[in-house]
């Protein structure tokens, strides 16, 4: 499939009746009494507003019935409410609904504001995980962990060399990373991603060889039910792999 065919496939999913299509189409919530936000790091989406473990077998620390899935950084979501203590927001993402820690969300004006921030080229994380270098001037991006499938807007064309917080961007991509301000609102801060990192500009070509290579990058890591333990379960593995080709 070409990039154009993948885009048409993504659009066609909105036409399939059922809950999955309803979730994918966040635009249906425009104009309603909802707030909007963006994940500022990989975070958990929970069935209830608590981070307490709820294993189906007593003492099993690899299981949690309340863990639904993981949300990658820079994912938009509709905010439908919050817990009594304000620690969790009830959200809808493009593929799941549940509760997300409020500290992992940056508030934005609306879905269009997020889309505007994504305009232009983007960098796709194609490695299992990419960890950014330490930044003593901007702790919100320092050492940021970016899982496979994460998409970040480019802040400049590849090859651009300029100063950023005391460093020159030689051999780095310049990207915009979502962060949460002190007042809870979303802000994008520039950061550097080394050209040696396992990333690509745009999406990978959708070939059998590339799909196999992407899946192989996760061999041997811990199975994480719903994204627990920093790992992936079966659906997250498939989802993160296919995001690298532009599938939603």
PLM feature spans:
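Catalytic cores of peptidoglycan-degrading enzymes
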Residues: 208-248
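Generic recognition of flexible, low-complexity loop/linker segments
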Residues: 66, 161-163, 225-227
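Signature of short aromatic-glycine-proline-rich micro-motifs recurring in repeat-based ectodomains
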Residues: 68-70
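Boundary regions of SH3-family modules and the immediately adjacent low-complexity/disordered segments
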Residues: 1-46, 50-62, 72, 76-78, ...
